[in-house]
From Swiss-Prot:
PANTHER family, per the entry: IMIDAZOLEGLYCEROL-PHOSPHATE DEHYDRATASE, IMIDAZOLEGLYCEROL-PHOSPHATE DEHYDRATASE HIS7
Pathway the protein takes part in: Amino-acid biosynthesis; L-histidine biosynthesis; L-histidine from 5-phospho-alpha-D-ribose 1-diphosphate: step 6/9
Subcellular location: Cytoplasm
GO molecular function, one term: imidazoleglycerol-phosphate dehydratase activity
InterPro entries: IGPD_sf, ImidazoleglycerolP_deHydtase, ImidazoleglycerP_deHydtase_CS, Ribosomal_Su5_D2-typ_SF
Any one of the GO CC terms: cytoplasm
Predominant cellular place of this UniProt entry's protein: cytoplasm
Enzyme Commission number, as recorded: 4.2.1.19
Entries under Pfam families matching the protein: IGPD
Protein name: Imidazoleglycerol-phosphate dehydratase
Domain of life from the UniProt record: Bacteria
Originating species: Psychrobacter sp. (strain PRwf-1)
Length: 208
């Protein structure tokens, strides 16, 4: 016997949220539908980040519309971090009271020689635990140090615990991309509804 997992039971509205973040450094707008089909448009002004957010959209089956106008003439740091922050806020808002969700998700994703494990807990306790031994400092113009800035921004504002471990990898592009794919699948699993527990919180504390 298996547990039935559904993105959204027929009697519940889609979980949709929109958030804007405007600072002297960036103007970010995010709309997310947790119960989508992987549709939407992404334009952050950082092409490599757009490519990675497409992985979240496609493999998580989240509808995502994201725009960011930032001070990329300085560097990409503010745009990447603030996109992570705003996306995290949108997920937290869309999840609502969290009743009925699976809460936990995990996935292994390969990309050629690279393999990453992602584990997500929609715990209400933000924390990023990451071990990605990059083999170079840049992928094209993308500084790999900014990879963690996106995820720190996301988890701190989505109120999730996330573990990301690249178990094998030599190509930094592959390491990053398979990490985003694994994260997308794990996040999808954690956000989905558990048919057997639709009206309860997945916590013995009765709080998340």
């Amino acid at each position: 016997m298996t547990t039935e997992i559904h993105s959204n039971p027929a009697n519940r509205p889609n979980r949709i949220a929109s958030v804007e973040r405007n600072t002297a450094e960036t103007q970010v707008s995010v709309t997310v539908n947790l119960d989508g089909t992987g549709q939407g448009k992404i334009d952050t002004g950082v092409p490599f980040l757009d490519h990675m957010l497409d992985q979240i959209k496609r493999h998580g089956l989240f509808d995502l519309d994201i725009t960011c106008k930032g001070d990329t003439y300085i560097d990409d740091h503010h745009s990447i971090e603030d996109t992570g922050i705003t996306l995290g806020q949108a997920f937290a808002k869309a999840l609502g009271d969290k009743k009925g969700i699976r809460r936990y998700g995990h996935f292994y994703a390969p990309l050629d020689e690279s393999l990453t494990r992602a584990v997500v807990d929609i715990s209400g306790r933000p924390g990023l635990h990451m071990d990605i031994p990059f083999t170079r400092s840049h992928v094209g113009n993308f500084d790999v140090d900014l990879f963690s800035e996106f995820f720190f921004g996301f988890v701190n504002h989505a109120w999730m615990t996330v573990h990301l471990d690249n178990l094998k990898g030599k190509n930094s592009h592959h390491q990053i991309e398979c990490t985003f794919k694994a994260f997308a699948r794990a996040l999808r699993m954690a956000c989905e509804y558990d048919e057997r527990a639709l009206n309860t919180l997945p916590s013995t504390k009765e709080a998340l």
